[in-house]
Regions:
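A metal-dependent hydrolase metal-coordination microenvironment
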Residues: 2-125
Length: 125
């Protein structure tokens, strides 16, 4: 019964996309490199992922400027995107933002410019 339902849903929905995943070193909780995240996702039948690493001030290393942090953050995405292009898996940039106003995490999907990211880190917790 369950396997029939899974098969039916798989036929109806052409896309299987992971909407929230982390990689290392951009996210401290990430267990895999960007390339490993992409390859593992493809091996499990995903057609795409949204790389939503943690985007918060506490991730900034001592002495690192906001711009340097953003560049380091984006590096994981660029690495994942290159691997995705190589093996045919769509990689979308996202982020998991925690703002100062509360301790909620917000998932943001889609592209963001480097300049916007630098401005956003100022609002991050």
């Amino acid at each position: 019964m369950i396997s029939e339902l899974v098969r039916s849903l798989s036929e109806q929905y052409k896309y299987k996309i992971e909407m929230h995943c982390h990689s290392m070193p951009a996210s401290a909780c990430g267990e895999f490199t960007p390339e490993e995240v992409v390859r593992t996702s493809a091996e499990h039948g995903y057609s795409g992922i949204v790389l939503t690493n943690h985007f918060m001030r506490k991730c900034i290393c001592d002495g690192e400027s906001d711009a340097e942090y953003v560049d380091r953050y984006l590096e994981d995405y660029y690495r994942a995107r290159l691997e995705g292009e190589r093996i045919g898996l769509e990689v979308i940039l996202g982020l998991e933002l925690r703002v100062r106003a509360n301790s909620n995490d917000y998932l943001i999907y889609g592209t963001i410019s480097r300049e916007d990211a630098i401005r956003m880190i100022g609002a991050a917790n």
